[in-house]
Amino acid sequence: MTIQVLNGPNLGRLGKREAAVYGSVTYAELVSLIEAEAAVLGVDVQVRQSDSEAELLGWVHDAADAKDPVILNAGAFTHTSVALRDACAELSAGLIEVHISNVHAREEFRHHSYLSALATGVIVGLGVQGYLLALRYFVASASS
């Protein structure tokens, strides 16, 4: 099993952008944390980030075709992209929606997600630990 970890716009700026909201962990450090946790769990992981909606859609389509589970932090596309929602509807191996910040404690426009209704689960506000929790969930659910 390869778990796809897909990150949307501005997540490549972690550690540089709004540290009070997103923390001080850089994107490179996040990738290292995810890869280290995947190694401990004995699972393959592919971590990607794009500011392009089209590229993100392509990766979701690839995951759907491969029947890979997806951990998705779509960033602002969470609140705006019907196209991403429609692509995620094709996922059959599970979708965990992750947000580093608690989007429900922020601006009103961040409270709506086009993805949550399709997700197996949603993790918000737990910082980068949310990704690791999502990894553990997929591994545990695959072995049960």
UniProtKB/Swiss-Prot annotation:
Residues the UniProt record annotates as site (Transition state stabilizer): 17
Pathway in which the depicted protein is active: Metabolic intermediate biosynthesis; chorismate biosynthesis; chorismate from D-erythrose 4-phosphate and phosphoenolpyruvate: step 3/7
Keywords: Amino-acid biosynthesis, Aromatic amino acid biosynthesis, Lyase
Reactions this protein catalyses: 3-dehydroquinate = 3-dehydroshikimate + H2O
BP GO annotations: amino acid biosynthetic process; aromatic amino acid family biosynthetic process; chorismate biosynthetic process; quinate catabolic process
PROSITE patterns associated with the record: DEHYDROQUINASE_II (PS01029)
Transmembrane region(s): none
Stored CDD domains: DHQase_II (cd00466)
Active site as annotated: 22 (proton acceptor), 99 (proton donor)
Enzyme Commission (EC) number: 4.2.1.10
Family membership noted in the UniProt record: Belongs to the type-II 3-dehydroquinase family.
General function of this protein: Catalyzes a trans-dehydration via an enolate intermediate.
Descriptive protein name: 3-dehydroquinate dehydratase
Organism field: Mycobacteroides abscessus (strain ATCC 19977 / DSM 44196 / CCUG 20993 / CIP 104536 / JCM 13569 / NCTC 13031 / TMC 1543 / L948)
Lineage: Bacteria, Bacillati, Actinomycetota, Actinomycetes, Mycobacteriales
